[in-house]
């Protein structure tokens, strides 16, 4: 299983991709159940569900309602455990406890990040026997993480990141003890990885997938090579098109941490571009709880329009004081170096169509526009591209 507040779909897609392209024998043709579709060469899109002939099932484990605690995985991957879905869990302590419960059901190894405070809190609460069969991957050193409780540390060397190549490159350092467990010899391994998808958050996702594949029996080199051919999960930094020098990208990010990681990746991929964001909040409860965090994350962009909230399972009447302006108001206390000429960098426009047209009118060649959110904001990429084309015809 692959669980976590963020990165589940990308990591489970990556693991499935690695097994499809590098798995042999019983690992070949895995089954997978993923909460999204997978981008394939030539613009093709693969369905997120597949019943394969192999012996492995890769399952994205959604934590939103606690149902992932019913799973009994052989390997449990936890990409992070930053608090979310507090409408269900009530508080961070119960949210963390659910991940501890999920990890405890793994019959084999647990693979989790050490770069996330929530995941580290989970590690500290694991049963000692579970902690000892946990693999922690991180850009941090052991002393920065704290007591590993017998877990094995796999370091990600981020010094080899490259913005100029258009790929995210890094090295995964696998200690000899883990290499031996995976049947890969008794020496330390240094695996160079080059991803087509940007951002250090994706370097972590890829590392988790590579480690899980190694534990299943894929050779380290083959796993790393397969990861390098992965084009991404749909709606994860997905290119929608380019019109008159303006690039439009779509992303599913709907939590402050995801948005922050997305915009960090955007700055790496487009270091000299103006970054504009059309953001649709998802859930009134999440907007209310994380309004300031949303504002801080969005401040990494140059220009932001927040649209009306996508309600999903909630009703506006239950949250009469929550709207797009909740985030805009919270942003008034957030410093911003790239404010527009009138001194503002963020505004609220409830109507998505109007907001998309407004953002398109502001664009200049080399700008990059992101449509961001878990709702129907994804449809606005085409609207923006059409508006850009019409403006220059």
Please annotate each region the language model reported.
Residues 40-42, 116-122, 142-146, 285-286, ...:
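Short, charged/polar "capping" segments at the starts of alpha-helices
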Residues 26, 100, 128-133, 179-184, ...:
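ATP-dependent carboxylate-amine ligase
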């Amino acid at each position: 299983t692959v669980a976590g507040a963020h990165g589940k779909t990308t990591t489970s897609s990556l693991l499935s991709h690695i097994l499809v392209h590098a798995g042999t024998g019983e690992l070949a043709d895995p089954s997978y159940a993923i909460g999204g579709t997978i981008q394939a060469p030539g613009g093709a899109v693969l369905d997120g569900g597949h019943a394969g002939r192999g012996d492995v099932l890769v399952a994205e484990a959604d934590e939103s309602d606690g149902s992932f605690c019913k799973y009994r995985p052989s390997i449990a991957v936890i990409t992070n455990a930053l608090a979310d879905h507090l409408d269900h869990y009530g508080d961070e302590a119960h949210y963390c406890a659910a991940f501890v419960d999920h990890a405890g059901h793994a019959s084999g190894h647990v693979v989790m990040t050490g770069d996330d405070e929530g995941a580290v809190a989970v590690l500290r609460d694991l049963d000692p026997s579970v902690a000892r069969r946990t693999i922690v991957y991180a850009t941090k050193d052991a002393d920065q993480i704290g007591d590993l409780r017998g877990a094995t540390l796999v370091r990600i060397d981020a010094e080899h990141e490259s913005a100029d190549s258009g790929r995210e490159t890094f090295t995964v350092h696998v200690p000899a003890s883990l290499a031996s467990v995976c049947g890969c010899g008794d020496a330390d391994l240094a695996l160079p990885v080059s991803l087509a998808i940007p951002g250090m958050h994706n370097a972590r996702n890829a590392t988790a997938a590579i480690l899980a594949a190694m534990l299943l029996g894929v050779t380290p080199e083959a796993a790393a090579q397969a990861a390098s051919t992965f084009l991404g999960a749909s709606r994860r930094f997905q290119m929608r098109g380019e019109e008159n020098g303006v690039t439009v990208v779509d992303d599913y990010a709907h939590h402050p941490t995801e948005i922050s990681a997305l915009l960090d990746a955007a700055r790496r991929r487009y270091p000299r571009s103006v970054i504009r964001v059309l953001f649709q909040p998802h859930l009134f409860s999440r907007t209310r709880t994380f309004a300031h965090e949303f504002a801080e994350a969005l401040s990494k962009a140059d220009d932001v329009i927040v649209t009306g909230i996508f309600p999903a399972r909630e009703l506006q009447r239950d949250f009469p004081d929550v709207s797009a302006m909740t985030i805009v108001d919270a942003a008034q206390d957030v410093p911003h170096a790239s404010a527009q000429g009138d001194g503002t960098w963020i505004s609220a426009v409830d109507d998505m169509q109007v907001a998309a047209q407004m953002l398109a009118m502001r664009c200049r060649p080399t700008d990059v526009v992101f449509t961001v959110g878990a709702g129907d904001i994804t449809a606005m990429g085409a609207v923006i591209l059409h508006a850009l084309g019409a403006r220059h015809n």
